[in-house]
Amino acid sequence: MNRYKISEEEVPYGILESFGLTREMVGDLPVDVLQAILSGRRSPILPIRVDDSEGNTIHARTRFSLVRREDGTVDVLFYPVLVESRLERFSEEQKQRLLEGKAVIAPMQDNNDNPAQAFHQIDSGTKQILSVPTPVIGRNLQIIADEFHLSHAEINCLQVGEPLTVAEGDDLMTIGIDLNEPTGILVCVGDGVQWKQEAKREWDKYNFGCFGCWVADGEGGLVYVHEDDYTEEMWNELKRSSQRRMQNANTPKM
């Protein structure tokens, strides 16, 4: 069984709904986002709400991911937005590099409570620390190094968390560690500035679905607006996007 590939029928909608994320809201996420979630990746930052034991409603912003338990069922992990990153276990130099968005290598505890070396990086959206064992990223780095014929000095540059720009024919390519990526490495066309822009995904302002629309909140996350609550601006944008789709569908392919 593939522990990381989850079918839509297995999604624990009941758990998500208890945190204010209805089946319709989840289904209205962009298709590429849904596919990523079903592959075990983390969601965008979304608003949730839950009632505590005293009946108070608590509102928060969080990412979530789907995980398969040992018994084969699927559960939900939440990654709430923190006020600030917890960096106590890192040196002052490592803290500075982490706050600059770079990856650092430092010990982490494995499942058997043994220290193991790992790459660490701050998720700028939630301020959570992302950690991946060094052998996993190291293997992927070696594949990239072979593909781009990187020197030992260039590989070392990547290992210490610095993006590397190389010439590939007539193009510039920039490579760097980004633990938000499935492979832990982001490769893009362009220089370091373009790499940073690529690493920080910007959502379209309006992401329309069947029942409502996910709207970019300006802070790297999304908020949901039901169709009944669309503003005039949203209706106009929906009309324009529908017209664009019709024009694209009617454009003859070369």
Model features per residue range: what roles?
Residues 1-35, 59-83:
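Charged, compositionally biased non-catalytic regions
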Residues 1-3, 48, 108-113, 244-254:
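Classical N-terminal secretory signal peptides
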Residues 15, 19-23, 121-254:
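A eukaryote-biased signal for long
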Residues 20-50, 81-112, 147-158:
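Short, flexible domain-boundary/linker segments around small modular repeats
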Residues 32, 58-65, 113-119, 161, ...:
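Short small/polar-residue motifs
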Residues 38-42, 54-58, 70, 112-114, ...:
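Solvent-exposed loop and beta-edge segments used for protein-protein assembly and interaction
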Residues 47, 58-65, 70-92, 100, ...:
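Beta-strand-dominated lipid-handling architectures at cellular/organellar boundaries
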Residues 49-54, 65-71, 109-113, 122-126, ...:
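Short, flexible beta-strand-to-coil junctions
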